[in-house]
Amino acid sequence: MQTEFVMAVCDVYVKWKQGDPPRYRCYVNDELFTERSWIWREQYLEEYIPIQAGPGHYTIRYELVEPEHARIKVHNLRVDTGPAIIDREGRVQIYTPERTE
């Protein structure tokens, strides 16, 4: 199966009141993409998610490691590079582009 490179982007914001910075995880389908500590206050970050995969639908999901201490917001999922769109369910849909020879 031929794979395509796609760069998905979304805006991420985490809010917490006190204590250590919260940690969050990002998954593509059910595969862990990254786990990070959120160290910024009052700031959205653009998170770039590289995907090298075959045609299909890919769900990008964020979760807090300890959800009782913070809230996470993810907005504006979009495709920056590659043959993909965001479908009606909010998933990245990779397609095979037509090749001219």
Predicted feature residues:
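Beta-strand-rich recognition domains
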Residues: M1-V28, T34, E47, A53-E101
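Aromatic sugar-binding surface patches on proteins
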Residues: R41-Y48
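A generic structural motif
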Residues: E35, I39-W40
